[in-house]
């Protein structure tokens, strides 16, 4: 999507888009990735903020002792952190192979499925750790994909002034997600 193709005889040459933030804010593509980032931030920060309580609730309702449930929730959070770092590396490579649009679609499709099924699937210590790892892996990917997508869509020249506007979505997701999760609980 990013660089616009211009016809040059039989060959296609790519003209990089270099857009200042004032112009970027008026683009549908900016608001699209901004909204996607809000939901990505909501998912990741909701899990960070609630995994311990969630683990305790779900595992204790499955007759796991409080001590074992606390240990499982702490272990799940550790796996979340490890896979978060790994996700940044792997999703960056995926973006290099398939491009930002497809990588973002893939990441958030998987993340959506994980978030929708977490409550039903994370009912054992092992499954809680597996889900926390997968969600952490995808959440880590957001931090590789969004800066690159910003550069691809709006130009590398202004990414330093453009990306902070994209990153405001993370703050909104960080406020709304945990509040929504607490309300739904």
Predicted regions and their residues:
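Cytoplasmic membrane-interface "Motif A"-like loop-to-helix N-cap segments
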Residues: 96-108
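Intracellular juxtamembrane helix-capping segments at the cytosolic ends
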Residues: 51, 141-154
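C-terminal ends and interior cores of transmembrane alpha-helices
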Residues: 109-123
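Extracytoplasmic gate region of multi-pass secondary transporters
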Residues: 22-92, 177-181
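Hydrophobic core of transmembrane alpha-helices in multi-pass small-molecule transporters
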Residues: 38, 127-141
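Transmembrane alpha-helical cores of Major Facilitator Superfamily
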Residues: 38, 78-82, 109, 133, ...
